[in-house]
Amino acid sequence: MGVIDNKEQRSLDEINSTIEFNDSQRTSQKFLAFLGPGLLVAVGYMDPGNWITSMQGGAQFGYTLLFVILISSLSAMLLQSMTVRLGIATDKDLAQMTRHYLNKPTAIIFWVIAELAIIATDIAEVIGSAIALDLLFNIPLIIGALITVFDVFLLLFIMKFGFRKIEAIVGTLIFTVLMIFVFEVYISSPNLIEILNGFVPHYQIIANHSILYIALGIIGATIMPHNLYLHSSIVQSRKYNRHSFTEKAQAIKFATIDSNIQLSIAFIVNCLLLVLGAALFYGVNSNNIGGFYDLYQALRTQPVLGVVMGSIMSTLFAIALLASGQNSTITGTLAGQIVMEGFLKLSIPNWMRRLVTRSLAVIPVLLCLVIFRGNESKMEQLLVFSQVFLSIALPFSLIPLQLATSNEKLMGPFKNKKWVNICAWGLIIILSFLNIYLIIETFKEL
């Protein structure tokens, strides 16, 4: 384990300690000042990579997998609360802390895996955004993918106005996605009794291989490696007394509540996706729900909805997909900066860092489009591959997080409680096993 240098550059230095609040403010006002970072984290739990598994799960198996979404969301809340404590208690992000734990060659391996995970995450956003542009404006996929490169410059422009503006934009886009799916689920008239029953565990989830496979897909796509790096850094954007136990404890409390609130919203969105799939397609034409284009066309031609409402719902679906892709663009590029600076102590101009990350994600998408001549199903298959790689990369983020947050020398009084350690190690073992199983099954079906 390396020696921690407290004089090294702060995590995301341009936003670190930039959001102030007055000590004389009431507790409720201080809490409001801490609302925001959880929004950026919640984006990863409802990105385009999650959409297919949730809607396919509903279309093929009704409401059965709502229980899996619930367990996945509770697990995410636990892990994200650990990253909050790590960031605030140590004033370091997960990338910096991982570097301190490992020797240089091993740290470089972990850095490469983290970078590839961010590129894999970005691939899903590029594909989701490009498909949304095609559905909404008939823009060819290759042009849509190229357009996404310029998203990074939009982020750079917004950053000039402060981190709060980014949080506000992300919050607006999340609210847009949420309202669209609330409306679509309302129109689809789901069975409320069956929805409630879906939150009860069913033995078929394990006994039925097909259900288990989709369940593993939901779990594997829920907890994203880049979110762990991102959250441990952006919680430090609030200006509190770094030497006061009381203020750190309060910061951890507020940031954890913020995280749980926003992840609850992500949980609702994922439930709405599954409910929509179940209400419209379960027992009707569930086998035809394979990708974004299939979902769009199925919504458009759904007999239950009618011509006008089907057109409205399919268009709203595409708008939500575009909003989700743009949201994830913001968080992915920030996570890329955190990983590079944290692992390598390398700081390059923000525009270059973000342009390189996005370009590396766009290249495989463009190659896929050129080689397969714009084949839509191949694009969606590439998205699935990107999610599989995220499953492989996950333990390389979870294990350093658990080791660091259970270390009393690093965390002091903020170290993990015994029950947290038990739950965290249990989650790591179960998630790693399930992800390995998912990878094997994915390659079997190729």
Swiss-Prot record:
It is found in: Cell membrane. GO terms for cellular component: plasma membrane. Keywords: Cell membrane, Ion transport, Membrane, Symport, Transmembrane, Transmembrane helix, Transport. Its main location: membrane. The keyword 4Fe-4S does not apply. The chain crosses the membrane at residues 32-52, 59-79, 107-127, 139-159, 168-188, 205-225, 264-284, 303-323, 355-375, 381-401, 420-440. The keyword Nucleotide-binding does not apply. One of its GO terms (biological process) is iron ion transmembrane transport. InterPro entries: NRAMP_fam. It comes from the Bacteria. One of its GO terms (molecular function) is manganese ion transmembrane transporter activity. It is a multi-pass membrane protein. Pfam families: Nramp (PF01566). Belongs to the NRAMP family. H(+)-stimulated, divalent metal cation uptake system. This is Divalent metal cation transporter MntH. It comes from Staphylococcus haemolyticus (strain JCSC1435).
